[in-house]
Amino acid sequence: MLVHAHPDDESTGTGATMARYANEGATVSLVTCTSGELGEVVADDLAHLRGNPDALGEHRRGEIAEALRELGDIRHHWLGGPGRFRDSGMAGEDTNDAAECFAKADRDDVTRAMVEILRAERPHVVVTYDDTGGYGHPDHIAANHALMYALGPAADPAYLPELGEPWDVPKVYWMTLPRSFVKDVQAAGIEGFEPFTVPDEDITAVLDGRDHHAKKLAALRTYRSQVSLDDGDFFATLVQDPRFAIEHYVLVRGERGPGSGPHNWENDLFAGLD
Ligand SMILES: CC(=O)N[C@H]1[C@@H](O[C@@H]2[C@H](O)[C@H](O)[C@@H](O)[C@H](O)[C@H]2O)O[C@H](CO)[C@@H](O)[C@@H]1O
Ligand SMILES: [Zn+2]
């Protein structure tokens, strides 16, 4: 199970991982916390969505449905239901304080909604952002908190038993990028990734999803409101590189399974589970 903040985050950060496990017949579920109502609309033929959060949210809900079909058989949940928690906007924007935004949502409401999904899906592995949200977006940080604060209650038989049988998630990973990745892409002229990386020795798992790079690209292409892969900017250049389908994780809960290479990286998130 993967927990992401906005439509398109799942494909950008973990699309190849999702495609690999869906291809292998594993049960892959996704929790998206907001519909991304405040995103910048990059496609001029979608200009009518600019300044119309409800319309953009509805449009992005359609985009993610199409994107997930490109990745494989993915079970999709909106945290609290579609539109329940709304996009908080980029860090520092006034919208970060809007009553209905995800970053300001009531902790009990968020935990209840996440526990309901955790107990329904009973995932052996859960993936989300690190506690910086990857790049500091309030909704990404809130998504990390939504999962991490729900792990205890989900496993507690005394917590809202009406939400289902308790479930203790065996393994949790946070997504990240190794510092070596930056050196690789800098050689290709792609700058700006350094702040979002960790030392290679801090990585615990690497999923080489290059066999699924095409699916990751196809999923990203469905997000026309947010992503243009043909404008030659650094992101468009990055995603075309097959190395973009190599996805890296740090284990933050559970036992590390067998690995390989100089840092003994796991190459399977289910490593060590029976
Ligand atoms: C990848 C991601 O998390 N995107 C978020 C982010 O989008 C950025 C935002 O629209 C900003 O104004 C742009 O300049 C930047 O290029 C975008 O990546 O924040 C949005 C608002 O919270 C969110 O909807 C989008 O999914
Ligand atoms: Zn996001």
Swiss-Prot record:
Q: Which UniProt keywords apply?
A: Hydrolase, Metal-binding, Zinc
How does the cofactor attach, per the note? Answer: Binds 1 zinc ion per subunit.
Annotated InterPro entries:
GlcNAc_PI_deacetylase-related, LmbE-like_dom_sf, Mycothiol_biosynthesis_MshB
One Pfam family from the record? PIG-L
Q: Name one GO biological process term.
A: mycothiol biosynthetic process
Q: Which cofactor does it need?
A: Zn(2+)
Which EC number(s) does UniProt give? Answer: 3.5.1.103
Chain sites annotated for binding Zn(2+): 6, 9, 140
According to the record, the signal peptide region is: none
Question: What is a single molecular function from GO for this protein?
Answer: N-acetylglucosaminylinositol deacetylase activity
From the UniProt record, list the reaction(s) this protein catalyses. Answer: 1D-myo-inositol 2-acetamido-2-deoxy-alpha-D-glucopyranoside + H2O = 1D-myo-inositol 2-amino-2-deoxy-alpha-D-glucopyranoside + acetate
Per its database record, what is this protein's job? Catalyzes the deacetylation of 1D-myo-inositol 2-acetamido-2-deoxy-alpha-D-glucopyranoside (GlcNAc-Ins) in the mycothiol biosynthesis pathway.
Family under the similarity heading: Belongs to the MshB deacetylase family.
Q: Which HAMAP family match?
A: MshB
In its UniProt entry, what is this protein called? 1D-myo-inositol 2-acetamido-2-deoxy-alpha-D-glucopyranoside deacetylase 2
